[in-house]
Amino acid sequence: MKKTKQWLLGVAAVAMSLSLVLNSAAANAWGPERPTYTMAKPAEKAVFNSITDNAAIGDERDFVRIAEVNSGKPFTSELIVEPDKDYIVMIYYHNDALATFNDTAHNRVGFAENVRMMSFFPEKLDKGERGKIDGVITTSNTDPATVWDEAYITAREAVTLSYIEWSAVIRNQKKTDGTLLSKALFTNEGVLLGTNSLNGLVPGCDEYAGQVYYRIHTTSVAVDPDPEPEPEPTPDPDPTPDPEPEPE
């Protein structure tokens, strides 16, 4: 299956668009509202993450998930994080166009062009604070040109969160499988996706789908103890009154 879409904007315009996207995402974990498809009835042009019954992931609009490393637990959209542990983020991508529309007879409308991905996560969470991990996919020739989703994390204790260097990797069934991704993933520019190379071209069909993974480490934050209350000063004892004079 395949889906294609064009969006000819410069990096500055992309940054402005992302600001609007991430601010509007508070109302919806995913967005924008868009037509949906099924595995039996995929799209007839390039479009990302809009199939609702994907056998691998379910509803593709829910495409950002997180799990604790080596926990044996599945990826989820909501997780409690603890200090001094590693977590792995998964961002799924799929051009939902039917493969038929990749050929020249159909003007290659199944191809998505200039496909980029970016992700953002909080640097610090206070105890009990809930934060979000954003995943965003943009293209230059699809409608919508940008799709996004969020996973949510809640801190059991106060923590900082840091990217584990060189953990970002693309996984798929094509030549780019296993390619490490730069930290541009965490900027408004993002990183290019691709199949035979990371050139931004993603044909339609599930055989060209994939995931981007990266890891986050949490570190406990030392909390200063409440200061000891200062003792109240001991009041001076009542002064001894002067003796009354003897009567003459």
Language model segments and positions:
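Exported/extracytosolic protein signature
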Residues: 18-21, 27-229
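Ser/Thr/Gly/Pro-rich low-complexity, disordered linker/stalk segments of secreted
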Residues: 223-248
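N-terminal secretory signal peptides that target proteins for export/translocation
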Residues: 1-3
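Sec-dependent N-terminal signal peptides
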Residues: 6-17
